[in-house]
Every structure is written in C-alpha cells, then in structure tokens.
Amino acid sequence: MEYHGGSYDVIVIGAGHAGCEAALASARIGAKTLVITLNLDMIAFMPCNPSIGGPAKGIVVREIDALGGEMGKNIDKTYIQIRMLNTGKGPAVRALRAQADKVLYQREMKKTLENQKNLTLLQGKVERLIVEDGVCKGVITQTGAHYYAKAVVITTGTFLRGEIIIGDIKYSSGPNNQQPSIKLSEHLEELGFELVRFKTGTPPRVNSRTIDYSKTEIQPGDEEPRAFSYETTKYITDQLPCWLTYTTEETHRIIDENLHLSPMYSGMIKGTGPRYCPSIEDKVVRFHDKPRHQIFLEPEGRETEEVYVQGLSTSLPEHIQRKLLETIPGLEKAQLMRAGYAIEYDAIVPTQLWPTLETKLVKNLYTAGQINGTSGYEEAAGQGIMAGINAAHRALGREEIILSRSDAYIGVLIDDLVTKGTNEPYRLLTSRAEYRLLLRHDNADLRLTELGYRIGLISEERYQAFLAKKEAIEREKKRLQTVIIKPTPEVQEVIRQAGGSELKDGIRAADLLRRPEMTYEHIQKLAPADEDIAPEVAEQVEIQIKYEGYIQKSLQEVERLKKMENKKIPEDIDYDAIQGLATEARQKLKQVRPLSIAQASRISGVNPADISILLVYLEQGRIARVSNE
C-alpha cells in the first residue's frame, strides 16, 4: 500500500562512505535530511580493504576534514595502525594511511549519524524516484512509502544490480552477501540515464591464529603521533602491526594452470575492472616476468581474528583459492574464513553530471561515490561531502559550490569524472593533479577551512584556531626574511654537520633554510624565535620557504587557468550553430556541456583550434548582446 512517509529538504539514498558525508554535510548546514539505507548495521561498511588513506587518497581525507566532514575524525578514533607514506620524498606526495578497525569504524560512524541534529535514519529500499517535469521531488520505497524532498542524493555504491562471482558461480548480491538494488537501476534507465557495467574484487580473509607470522616481515605503524583530522588531539598509541609476505613461483604456476576457471578470462565477467587494483590472476598474466608479488596481511580489527590478504584479490574458484594460500610463506596452514570474490555493478556515465554532481537529465538529483564510476572509500566520501553541500544549498536556496582543480584533489576527481568520463573504475592518483605541489597533505586546512567555515561546517572555535595558525605562519616567515645569521664558528659547525658548505658572509635565515640540507630545526638552533612555534606552523614555514619558487610558478599557472575558468559558456549554447567546429569536438561538447572555456579545453577530442572557434563565437555573441542593449 502506498502512503505519504514525510517531507524533507534532502534525501540521501545509501549510507556508505559517500552517503554518510552527504547526509552529515546536509544536516549540519541546516537542511532537514533523511538517509534511507538497506541495512542500518552496515553504515560506513568497508567491504574491501580495511584501511583509509594512501597516496592522493589520504590527502582527500584531509580535504574532507578541512571542509568539515567526518571521515578523518572517525578513522582517528578507530584505527589500529597509522603510517605516513613517502616520507623520503617531497611534500607533494606525502600521504597518511591508517588500518581501520572496520567494525569500530562502522559503529562510531553510525553513532555520529544517530546523534546528528536535522538527520533522520531509516532502513529501507528505494525503488523509484518521484520525477515530475524533469525535476526530482522525492523517492518511493519498497514498502510503498512516498518521501518528498527538494533535493535527492543517490549514493548506492556497488549495489545497483550487483552480482557476486566466484569461479563459475554467479548470483545477485550486493557486497559481502547483502541484498542488491535492482529496481532502482532499472528505474534510472527508464529515466534515460546511460549506465555502464563495472567490476571490482576483494581477496580472501584468513584466521589470524592459523598464520605462521615467523615467515613474514613485520610492518609496524609510526611511533610519532599522527592524525587525519585537524581537530584530533588524542592519539591511539597501542597499534597493531601488519605483516608482509610474497607469492611464490608455485602460486603463479597454479594461477597459470587454472586461468580457464577465472571468470575474468572465461568471459563470465563483462564489467571493466580497476586498472590500479588488479586481481592476482591479472598481475600474474600482465607481469609474467616477476617471480613474486607482495602480499600484506592486514588485521580487520581488535576484536576479530579475520585477516585481510591484501594483494591476493581474486575471483578464482574457492578450492583454487585454498591451494594458492598454501603456496604463500606463512599462510601454508591458514584457514580460509571468507573466499575472495568479484562483484559486477551498474554505474552512471559521469559525463551526465554537472560539476556540482547534479544530473543534467533530472534537476535536483545528485549522485556521489561508486555510482559515478569511482573506486575507493575516500573518493566516494569526497564526492559525498560535495553532493551533500550542493543538495542542501539547492534545498535552502543558496549558491552552488564547485572546487577547482587548483583547490583540491576533490576538485580534480570531480572535474575528471564530469569532463572526461571514465571507462574503468576511477582511482585518484597524485599524477592526475597538475597542481599537486599546491594540493598537499600538510596544507589542506589552508586551502579549504575558509570555505568550510563560510558554508557552516566549521565551528567558530575551530575557525579561530585556524586563523591563529595562519597568522603564526606569516609572522615566522616574516621573521626569517629579516633575521641575519652571521658566519660564527657555532653557525659553521651546525652547517657542516648538516652536510652544507660554510658561510662566507651573513645570510638571511630564510635564504639559509632554502638550502636542501638545512631544516627548520637547524634554523631554530641558529636563530631561535621568541615565541613557541607549534610543529604544524614550523612545517608550513619550512615548506613555504623551501619550495617558494616552485609554488609561485604553480600559482602563476593557476592564475592563467582562472582566466579561462572565468570565460563562462552559457548552458543553453547551440553547438550546431557554431561553424568550423570539428565533428568530434561538436559531439563531445554537446555531451559534456562544459560550463567554462577551461573545462571545454580538458575534454578529450576538443582541440585548441576548436577552442579558438568557440572563443570567437562567444565573443561575437557578447558584442551582439552589448550592441542590442
């Protein structure tokens, strides 16, 4: 029986990593928000690796936190291990990664949602959207409830027509044997959305008590206190190690002999898999010359014996998976607790979205997370917070928010999706960001906290602390520009010990800090500050002074880009009326409908000549409008 379930400002479908951020952002902004999810016990569930962060992804978590999101705070409360990666490299590629206690992570996130003002949680299955005259007005659940809203966000992950595949067995399912969402997928097609079939996979889990850890290498966490969130002040000290082992030639032989049983090679899997997270059979085939591959053994939590066998993602039959485990040092007698599997699911072609993550086809409808063709919890959460902000702003009549490629990795991610699309599950990499020196782990707050505060997601107390930090950085930079360090014997000794060449004359402290071998600690010894300098202030001062030339160069490029971003393209432009455009360019421009010349220039198939023609056309139109006025 159909009935009226209630009216809201925003409805979020799904409470995975995208849905949680979308719902919390919306509610915190002040929109009356409803989250409908298939299973309230699976909020923020980690169906694949029990970790948050890593290269590029860790920076996204920092950005979510700088905007006022939850993922960073939640992992800081629940990790079992944390490490800073790439510490031997430059600041642009450093990133934090934490192993999660996945059950605790879920529990804490559920608690946060339950206690959030303006937020209602509901277990249910959305099967249809209420769409009138191309505008989304709400949702209809399996039980016939009609819920109305001014904006709807779909964050259904890998549940849309999900199918699990192990060997020659294939059955309808969401991740981890949860119920899939079939009717909503069919309904999206009815509305005219183009869907694609993607695939992802997960490795087996084994019982920790049956692993011989003496045959593996220990991988401890960092002793230095670390956190994703700028608000975290308490650090977990009793960390659990991970362990490293390797596949063997015997592992590879078994895979080679049984490739015909792999659904990837038998033709059973039609969906495109993630390039940067290949299955073990894929690795063995593609890198046949490699005698071994790394396998990390990652505990899934403090209260469980389940261990995630990272690097052994597979959809081979279960009996073959058991044979593979027996060939890996340390896992010879490991008990299989859950078999690895592949999952195929529907995703929306993301060029059907505006940069706000609103769909072009249906107004007031937003999508975020794996439904948009991405892979990874962090990518999902980054889209979730932006979709939640924009949905709430639409409902409350506020301006839309779009992060540019020079603002954040989240901006790079969304721009790549809506401008270029993706023909495989999209993973964020540092190499995708042309301004990666500006988009660092250490400066996410300096880039985004101002915006988070303006939107209403950052508290006054946190904002004041942020302003104090900013002022302290500027004060110390100014001091180092004026203080002169003279070539005294003590100074020469410090420089010699650091591996540098001695001073001939006095030098400004900032210029000495620019030398590769010198650190801020050295400068503090030679020219101590009058005030206590917090470690995060010292870090910023050192990076900003050391890399000043490169940063300035990047900022000049950003200014050039902004000029192109400011050249707006009307939404209702008729590309068929523009003479001289190449056929491919015309087709791509009509499909993507870019909002600026900068976005148009990033579409594959649109050449500089096409951009010139487009610029002339827009200029002629502007002149015509001015003369008519």
UniProtKB/Swiss-Prot annotation:
<keyword id="KW-0285">Flavoprotein</keyword>
<dbReference type="InterPro" id="IPR044920">
    <property type="entry name" value="MnmG_C_subdom_sf"/>
</dbReference>
<dbReference type="InterPro" id="IPR047001">
    <property type="entry name" value="MnmG_C_subdom"/>
</dbReference>
<keyword id="KW-0520">NAD</keyword>
<dbReference type="InterPro" id="IPR036188">
    <property type="entry name" value="FAD/NAD-bd_sf"/>
</dbReference>
<dbReference type="GO" id="GO:0030488">
    <property type="term" value="P:tRNA methylation"/>
</dbReference>
<feature type="binding site">
    <location>
        <begin position="273"/>
        <end position="287"/>
    </location>
    <ligand>
        <name>NAD(+)</name>
    </ligand>
</feature>
<dbReference type="GO" id="GO:0005829">
    <property type="term" value="C:cytosol"/>
</dbReference>
<keyword id="KW-0819">tRNA processing</keyword>
<keyword id="KW-0274">FAD</keyword>
<dbReference type="InterPro" id="IPR004416">
    <property type="entry name" value="MnmG"/>
</dbReference>
<dbReference type="Pfam" id="PF13932">
    <property type="entry name" value="SAM_GIDA_C"/>
</dbReference>
<comment type="subunit">
    <text>Homodimer. Heterotetramer of two MnmE and two MnmG subunits.</text>
</comment>
<dbReference type="InterPro" id="IPR040131">
    <property type="entry name" value="MnmG_N"/>
</dbReference>
<comment type="similarity">
    <text>Belongs to the MnmG family.</text>
</comment>
<dbReference type="InterPro" id="IPR049312">
    <property type="entry name" value="GIDA_C_N"/>
</dbReference>
<dbReference type="InterPro" id="IPR020595">
    <property type="entry name" value="MnmG-rel_CS"/>
</dbReference>
<dbReference type="Pfam" id="PF21680">
    <property type="entry name" value="GIDA_C_1st"/>
</dbReference>
<dbReference type="Pfam" id="PF01134">
    <property type="entry name" value="GIDA"/>
</dbReference>
<keyword id="KW-0963">Cytoplasm</keyword>
<dbReference type="InterPro" id="IPR026904">
    <property type="entry name" value="MnmG_C"/>
</dbReference>
<feature type="binding site">
    <location>
        <position position="181"/>
    </location>
    <ligand>
        <name>FAD</name>
    </ligand>
</feature>
<comment type="function">
    <text>NAD-binding protein involved in the addition of a carboxymethylaminomethyl (cmnm) group at the wobble position (U34) of certain tRNAs, forming tRNA-cmnm(5)s(2)U34.</text>
</comment>
<dbReference type="GO" id="GO:0002098">
    <property type="term" value="P:tRNA wobble uridine modification"/>
</dbReference>
<feature type="binding site">
    <location>
        <position position="370"/>
    </location>
    <ligand>
        <name>FAD</name>
    </ligand>
</feature>
<feature type="binding site">
    <location>
        <position position="126"/>
    </location>
    <ligand>
        <name>FAD</name>
    </ligand>
</feature>
<dbReference type="InterPro" id="IPR002218">
    <property type="entry name" value="MnmG-rel"/>
</dbReference>
<feature type="binding site">
    <location>
        <begin position="14"/>
        <end position="19"/>
    </location>
    <ligand>
        <name>FAD</name>
    </ligand>
</feature>
<dbReference type="GO" id="GO:0050660">
    <property type="term" value="F:flavin adenine dinucleotide binding"/>
</dbReference>
<protein>
    <recommendedName>
        <fullName>tRNA uridine 5-carboxymethylaminomethyl modification enzyme MnmG</fullName>
    </recommendedName>
</protein>
